[in-house]
Amino acid sequence: LVTRVFPDGIDKLPKYSTPGDPRLMEYYEMALAAHVAPAPKFATEYRSLVGGIAWVGPSERPDALHANGSCARAYTFSTVELYGCAVRILLYLADTCELGITFSAYAPNADVLDAASDSDWHVTRSTSGGGLRLAGGTAHAVSRKQDSGSGSSAGAEIIAASGLCDDIAHARGCLEYMNLPQSAPTVIDVDNKAVYDVSRNYSATKNLRHLDRRAFRIREYTFTNVVAARLVRTTENWADMFTKVLDRGPFLKFRRLVLNPIDSVVARVSAVIGGIWAPT
């Protein structure tokens, strides 16, 4: 894909430390408002580029999942600005092609599944983001547009968390089939207190009565000991990577948590050999 898009190579092109352009969502909102169908040739080039990048997103490079997903929403009303955002994603992936998800038995609690959920609220349809980690690496990641709009950030966060709980329930079933049962509820990190409170309380409030009953599945999964919500700061919620365009600092911090790069694994193995640290 890089050779086809850049036949002269990428050595003289800009280097990017993050895949998402700072104005990505602004460009998307402008394109959505205009909603002008592109020329057929440009539309084909755009879909080819964004569709090609999408192949590596969920399974190999979830760090680019949100940026690519945002570009993919504009298939029918793509613009030159969004094409430039897609080119940036491709350049970022090409410059960091040595990165990937690393699973290691030396990761802390390697046999325990953990998760994180987040949402980016919009007036129209918000973005649900989250992931499941096992053995240090992200085994499953999502960044998807919600089925319907939500009138509040709390509602969008609840919908996102409940959707990820379905994925957690499926993953726990697969792990049990693979002889790796989860003896305790899977911890899911959330950074919204409304989600945390809803998961622990069956009562409803007037501000949340507009949500469908299915949006409260996190509460049902909590009371059946499938998940356990944990309230964390936004700066500690690695699912933020799947819902927002982050600056370099927080992006690199969350990328290490999501990908578990090989240098982290080597450091742990060296510590084990030296008797400094032992896996749990």
Segments (PLM) and residue ranges:
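Long, low-complexity, charge-biased intrinsically disordered regions
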Residues: 1-280
